[in-house]
């Protein structure tokens, strides 16, 4: 079952990205390197509830 999640920047805490994930294959929190428009660089983004 796929669920929609929000990704939050770890440095500025802005929630910029929406994505989906399969909970069966990825049970832990998702962490991706994405571009942060506020900081204008690539930073680590973590899944929020």
Swiss-Prot record:
Which Pfam families has this protein been placed in? Ribosomal_L33
User: Ribosomal protein: present as a keyword of the record?
Assistant: yes
Membrane-spanning intervals of the chain: none
Q: Record's Gene3D superfamilies?
A: Ribosomal protein L33
Q: Name one GO molecular function term.
A: structural constituent of ribosome
* GO aspect biological process, one term: translation
Q: Which PROSITE patterns match?
A: RIBOSOMAL_L33 (PS00582)
- The keyword Ribonucleoprotein is annotated on this UniProt entry: yes
Identify the keywords attached in UniProt to this record, alphabetized: Ribonucleoprotein, Ribosomal protein
User: InterPro entries, from UniProt?
Assistant: Ribosomal_bL33, Ribosomal_bL33_CS, Ribosomal_bL33_sf, Ribosomal_zn-bd
The cross-references to HAMAP family, in alphabetical order and at most eight, read:
Ribosomal_bL33
Family according to the record: Belongs to the bacterial ribosomal protein bL33 family.
Matching PANTHER family: 50S RIBOSOMAL PROTEIN L33, CHLOROPLASTIC, LARGE RIBOSOMAL SUBUNIT PROTEIN BL33C
What is the protein name for this chain? Large ribosomal subunit protein bL33
Organism of this sequence:
Limosilactobacillus reuteri (strain DSM 20016) (Lactobacillus reuteri)
- What is the organism lineage in this UniProt record? Bacteria, Bacillati, Bacillota, Bacilli, Lactobacillales
């Amino acid at each position: 079952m796929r669920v929609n999640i929000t990704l939050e920047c770890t440095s500025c805490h802005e929630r910029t990205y929406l994505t989906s994930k399969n909970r069966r294959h990825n049970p832990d929190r998702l962490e991706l390197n994405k571009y942060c428009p506020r900081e204008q660089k690539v930073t680590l983004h973590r899944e929020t509830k």
